[in-house]
Amino acid sequence: NQLSTGVPLIVTDQDLSPDISKGYSVGDLITGFGVAESVIHYYKIYKDNIKGKRAIIQGWGNVAGAAAYYLAKSGVKIVGIIDKPGGVIKKEGLSINKITDLLINRSSNFLECNDMISFNQVNKEIWDVQAEIFIPAAASKLLLLSQIERMINNNLEVISCGANVPFADKEIFFGPISKMADKKVSVIPDFIANCGMARAFSY
């Protein structure tokens, strides 16, 4: 009974909902919120200021969109979004208003905007955009070794896994790509970063 009440509960706090009039539920937002909070907590642990850090987001479903929104609210500059239909790159960072618009005006779980560039173009360019934070929050097993290496060469500090098993390893959990990433940068694994809904289920 608690679950049937809590998961569809409408978020009415203006500090937590991107748009109260849209009627976002706990289930819509909580996983992305947790992904963002894992990054915020990471920088608190290492006594580094998250404001002004730059982030690349992979995906634009509930997890990716909400994570981007909460990170932007915390002062992170979202410099790129890559999704199945295409993407957006803005090296100076998308405004919080733009991120909010992209989230609340979706008609599907994919990125929709007038200035979207093609997938081929964004996939060619985005891995070389300077960013400290990467949020893989699309499908599983998409993230290639070459893409991680390019991001590492452009100041990557932390990967927070919004998707389950985001690395393109043959192994189920911990293969050579994820091992390399974990040696070079901080990797917040899926079972920590994206457990928001699971945590709600344990309520």
Where are these regions (language model features)?
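N-terminal ligand-binding/catalytic initiation module
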Residues: N1-S25
